[in-house]
From Swiss-Prot:
GO terms for cellular component: host outer membrane. This is Putative protein LomR. It comes from Escherichia coli (strain K12). InterPro entries: Enterovir_OMP, OMP/PagP_b-brl. It comes from the Bacteria. Belongs to the outer membrane OOP (TC 1.B.6) superfamily. Ail family. Pfam families: Ail_Lom (PF06316). Gene3D superfamilies: 2.40.160.20. This protein is encoded on Rac prophage.
Length: 51
C-alpha cells in the first residue's frame, strides 16, 4: 500500500481585540492511495474468531 498526502492553507488574519479575530483561509489538498488485489480485510468477532 502506498500513500501520498499534501496540503497547503494560506490566508490573512486580523486580531481586533482580545475577544475578536477575523481570518480567511484558502487551501488545496492532494491525496493518492494505491493498493494491490492481494489486500484483504479479515472480519472477526469480539473473541478473535473469523466469521
Amino acid at each position: 500500500m502506498r500513500n501520498r498526502w499534501f496540503s497547503v492553507m494560506v490566508g490573512p488574519s486580523v486580531r481586533v481585540n482580545e475577544w475578536f479575530s477575523a481570518y480567511a483561509m484558502a487551501g488545496m489538498a492532494y491525496s493518492r492511495v494505491s493498493t494491490f488485489s492481494g489486500d484483504y480485510l479479515r472480519v472477526t468477532d469480539n473473541k478473535g474468531r473469523c466469521e
